[in-house]
Structures are given as C-alpha cells and as structure tokens.
Regions:
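Cross-family detector of peptidyl-prolyl cis-trans isomerase
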Residues: 2-134
Length: 134
C-alpha cells in the first residue's frame, strides 16, 4: 500500500512539472548579471558581437533551463533583426559581461515559435556574453 501511495505521489509531482515545451507565458522578462563587464556599454543602435547559449524555459530545470536549442557567436545591431527580448537583454551590458536573460513569448517568438526547435508560446533562457562593440 505504501508503494502504491509513493507511486501516486511521484506521478502527481511529475505531472505537475513543466515540460521544456510547455507554454510559459506567465514568466516575466528578467536579467541576471553573471559577470559584470568593464568595457564599453551596449546601447540601442550599437553593433555588438556576442557569444550565446539558448534554452527553452523549464521550471524544473537547473536555473530554469530545459532543452538547449542553440549556441553560437553572432554580430547584430541592438534593436534590429533580433527578437525584442534579446535586444532588451543586451542593452546596458558592458563588454566582457555575461548575462542570463529570461524572455517571455511576447518578447520572443510568440504564438508562432521558430522552426522545429522553438515551439509556440515558449519562454526562452539565454546566457549572453558581450564580446565586443566594434
């Protein structure tokens, strides 16, 4: 009987956990500086180079990280050609800094998602390192 009760409790806990693809629209935008940079500051309109890792939000994961969907290095202009939350997340960073950014669907890919890797209504977690402002 105790075994059955334990199985039921465990099943209830697992069922209540967020999956990496569960819509998570109630999670707010937030940033956490993991390392504060000492170089020039990124402002809207700055051309920046960043290293990044991206995960789907999962409330049961370490640091709310679920499935990693992307990683790399790229250059862009803050406020142009990237999702709004990514631009907002890098604004105010200084070169050499690393920031964890939580992006709700409204500032990310919304109800459309992106390809096969980011489902509709996904909250995203990025860790971004500001490499340079050329």
């Amino acid at each position: 009987m105790k075994l059955l009760a334990s199985v039921i409790v465990l099943a209830s806990l697992v069922a209540g956990c967020s999956s990496p693809t569960e819509p998570s629209a109630n999670v707010p935008f937030s940033t956490v500086d993991l390392r504060v940079g000492t170089g020039p500051e990124a402002v809207p309109g700055s051309r920046v180079t960043v290293n990044y890792n991206g995960w789907l939000y999962n409330s049961g994961g370490v640091d709310n990280k679920g499935t990693r969907f992307d990683a790399g290095t790229f250059q862009y202009v803050i406020g142009q050609n990237v999702i709004t939350g990514f631009s907002q997340g890098t604004t105010g960073m200084r070169v050499g800094g690393i920031r964890r950014v939580t992006i709700p669907p409204s500032l990310g890919y919304g109800s459309q998602g992106s390809g096969q890797t980011i489902p509709p209504n996904s909250t995203l977690i990025f860790e971004i390192e500001l490499v340079s402002i050329p």
